[in-house]
Amino acid sequence: MSTRPVPVPETCSASYALMTPDALDHEDHLAMPNEALLRRYGSTDESLARLRECPHQLLIHCQAPTEVMADAVRDCRIQALDLAAQHDGIVVELLPPRVLELRPEQVSLAHAQQWYVLDYDDLSEGLLRTDGLEQFGLPEVTVADVDPATHAMTDAVLAGLTHRLIAEWPTNDPVGPATVTLRDIAFGLGDAEASRIPEGRAIDVIIDYEPGPHRLIVELMGDPAEALFA
């Protein structure tokens, strides 16, 4: 019996809808997320306008063992974006539902923010949640005790933490104390100069796992403004 607090699923999956103005050799007919939902998860008016001009659909699905899912879903996303570029199309990620506004060469596992969206619905109660990490077999993350007035700094810390989670999962169980460095944050935010940032500045966090909702609960052990950005 495993002593790991967080269970590791055998396989994970992710799906993309390639939407094109003209039909390809094969066409799928999966019901698409509505515009309100796509907008809620960050899709822009410009991308939604492009989507309206692309009525034809090709479903691209990725399923792989959890141990290799990160590389598999990265390659699947690149494939979808490559096809979109070839056929003047657009790619919709199905979970979380959003239009992907990336070029194939921009796809990066290190740039963790590419792989999740933030749910601010309960920010007034001090809670910040991710949506998207499930595709790696990870639980979604909830950060507790977030100050709504300064949540942008917590957003940044979360980008650094998810950078580490994606890189270390499933080899390392995430539960317990952890340290998020300014370099981790830079990688998670997609900073091209991340590798040159000194590792000195950091903030400690405590990560717990709640099996019922299957979520990681994160508590910051300090003020990001003082620990990282002062």
Language-model region placement:
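Long, low-complexity, Ser/Thr/Gly/Pro-rich intrinsically disordered segments that act as flexible linkers
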Residues: 1-42, 47-53, 192-196, 206-208
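Internal, hydrophobic cores of structured domains that mediate oligomerization or house catalytic pockets
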Residues: 26-129
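Short, flexible beta-strand-to-coil junctions
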Residues: 19-21, 62-67, 167
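Aromatic/basic-lined ligand-recognition segments
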Residues: 95-230
